[in-house]
Amino acid sequence: MGQKVHPYGFRLGYTKNWLSRWFSSKDYPAFVYEDDSIRKYVKEKIFHAGVSKIEIERAGGKIRLIIHTARPGIIIGRKGVEIEKLREDLRRKFNKEFALEVSEIRRPETDAQLVAENIAQQLERRVAFRRAMKRIVGLARKFGAEGIKVACAGRLAGAEIARTEWYRDGRVPLQTLRADIDYGVARANTTYGVIGIKVWIFKGEILDHEVEQ
């Protein structure tokens, strides 16, 4: 039976770049754990800002975060007040110096992570899962996605037995390395239990094989 490899891990160094970029010979496990803690902390603090991914770079004891968000204004705040507050909160919690950079996501409708989280929020508001999936798929296609696949797994519509249902529109070539596949996962905590959501979005082919910056 065929299994699906993670679309990012499959393309690392070819068309995708690492989200954590640093080198360490001794403190590697501690840094990996710290990176995960930083991402969770930032995501919780600014969840309402539509954060897709957080890149982490380390150099000389200083940590640089690149936050990809659909609403940069919420993170930065008036005259940079909010981003400065976030930087100070990070410094106090992790006892390290941080440099924060905000990158705007121009089309959140074609960002897989934001799409997955959007579906999760709809399911938690008791929107029918098929309606939520079809609406999201239509939006992504309207905003330029060449293909999209959405999968929901769990006690869908309160069913006794958990199952997986998926919906696809367009082309999603997971085995083509030059295909620019965006991938996102989210979980919806409903009254019937947890529902897992996975989203694959095909944005076109990268023909020059340059790793994304």
Swiss-Prot record:
SUPFAM superfamilies (UniProt xref): Prokaryotic type KH domain (KH-domain type II), Ribosomal protein S3 C-terminal domain
Superkingdom as given in the UniProt entry: Bacteria
Residue ranges crossing the lipid bilayer per the database entry: none
Keyword terms of this UniProt record: Ribonucleoprotein, Ribosomal protein, RNA-binding, rRNA-binding
Family: Belongs to the universal ribosomal protein uS3 family.
Quaternary structure annotation from Swiss-Prot or TrEMBL: Part of the 30S ribosomal subunit. Forms a tight complex with proteins S10 and S14.
Function: Binds the lower part of the 30S subunit head. Binds mRNA in the 70S ribosome, positioning it for translation.
Protein name: Small ribosomal subunit protein uS3
Lineage: Bacteria, Pseudomonadati, Thermodesulfobacteriota, Desulfovibrionia, Desulfovibrionales
Gene: rpsC
